[in-house]
């Protein structure tokens, strides 16, 4: 169904979100800080990342840029305990899919993950299709003359 990485330093939130999202059929990975989150992103290549704004080793708003640099097709949803408009605007500018308040409405999180997952899945599929269309074999060919050169 897809992979979701949750980055949050609050163990209860991490556990609750992991359980709820896992019950929907997603494969869930966890991280309690930015450093581990980046490592999990690189190792597991999730389509969707849920990230807390306030982390012990950095800001989730700033982390969005790094996550998008490493995995541009993954979608990042930022979670905050205290939403404010400037952080939300900056998060979107940095490439976040959305910015929501924790506990605001827990019924919003699963549909939001589904939308982000759909967008990421389409992007990954398009990238794969373009890669096949413009691979070495289709652009250069596999004639005996080309085989001799390569």
Annotated model-derived regions:
Residues 8, 52, 80:
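Active-site residues of response regulator receiver
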Residues 11-29:
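Two-component/phosphorelay signaling modules centered on CheY-like receiver
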Residues 14, 56, 84:
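The feature encodes the CheY-like receiver
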Residues 33, 59-62:
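Acidic catalytic/metal-coordinating carboxylates
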Residues 39, 61-73, 90:
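Short amphipathic alpha-helix used as the core "switch/output" element in two-component signaling
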Residues 44-50, 55:
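Active-site beta3 strand of CheY-like receiver
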Residues 129-150:
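AAA+ ATPase active-site-proximal loops
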């Amino acid at each position: 169904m897809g992979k979701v990485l949750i980055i949050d330093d609050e163990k209860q939130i991490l556990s609750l979100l992991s359980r709820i999202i896992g019950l929907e059929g997603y494969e869930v990975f966890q991280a309690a800080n930015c450093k581990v989150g980046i490592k999990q992103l690189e190792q597991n290549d999730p389509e969707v990342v849920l990230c807390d704004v306030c982390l012990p080793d950095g800001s989730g708003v700033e982390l969005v840029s790094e996550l998008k640099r490493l995995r541009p097709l993954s979608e990042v949803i930022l979670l905050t305990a205290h939403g404010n408009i400037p952080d939300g605007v900056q998060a979107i500018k940095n490439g976040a899919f959305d910015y929501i308040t924790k506990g605001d409405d827990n019924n919003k999180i699963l549909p939001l993950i589904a939308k982000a997952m759909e967008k990421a899945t389409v992007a990954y599929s398009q990238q794969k299709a373009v890669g096949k269309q413009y691979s070495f074999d289709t652009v250069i060919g596999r004639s005996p003359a080309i085989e001799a050169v390569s």
